[in-house]
Amino acid sequence: MISKIKELFASFMLLELVKGMALTGRYFFARKVTVQFPEERTPISPRFRGLHALRRYPNGEERCIACKLCEAVCPAMAITIESEQREDNTRRTTRYDIDLTKCIFCGFCEESCPVDSIVETRIFDYHGEKRGDLIYTKPMLLAVGDKYEEQIAADRAADARYR
């Protein structure tokens, strides 16, 4: 008799259905873990790789020495740099563009920079309404760096022992 009932349950997959419903019921009454994004924010790691920024030295001079290592190491070829020689025989960038539609946010540009000029910030909620809005130029990158310099410096200090 019991084997017939088991066979009936197995043939109609009722046992699996009951197991599935029990699992669903258990999670239905459990505590919710969903974060309602625009209203609630989760903590972001100091190592988060978000929007790029160009940094300056404390005296106001931009750090980039136009070595073009970041452009060479970028696997997506998202960085474009043009430079010129100055009178004191140092190079400075005249053009520094990052195409965020191509960028894969791998962080190679940040790792390869010898003067810590290009960094990736914690900013992840930016948008563009047109494709051209996501091409960040040198003044835009410097503005991001100037605005978030304190946070960038704190993140770099927190991560210093791992570099």
Curated annotation (Swiss-Prot):
Names of required cofactors: [4Fe-4S] cluster
Residue stretches in coiled coil: none
GO BP annotation list: aerobic respiration
Top-level taxon: Bacteria
One Gene Ontology MF term: quinone binding
InterPro entries, alphabetized: 4Fe4S_Fe-S-bd (IPR017896), 4Fe4S_Fe_S_CS (IPR017900), NADH_quinone_OxRdtase_chainI (IPR010226)
Membrane topology, record value: Peripheral membrane protein
Pfam families assigned: Fer4_7 (PF12838)
Catalytic activity: a quinone + NADH + 5 H(+)(in) = a quinol + NAD(+) + 4 H(+)(out)
Documented EC number(s): 7.1.1.-
Entry's localization field: Cell inner membrane
Assembly: NDH-1 is composed of 14 different subunits. Subunits NuoA, H, J, K, L, M, N constitute the membrane sector of the complex.
Family that this chain belongs to: Belongs to the complex I 23 kDa subunit family.
Record's function text: NDH-1 shuttles electrons from NADH, via FMN and iron-sulfur (Fe-S) centers, to quinones in the respiratory chain. The immediate electron acceptor for the enzyme in this species is believed to be ubiquinone. Couples the redox reaction to proton translocation (for every two electrons transferred, four hydrogen ions are translocated across the cytoplasmic membrane), and thus conserves the redox energy in a proton gradient.
Protein name: NADH-quinone oxidoreductase subunit I
Origin species: Methylobacillus flagellatus (strain ATCC 51484 / DSM 6875 / VKM B-1610 / KT)
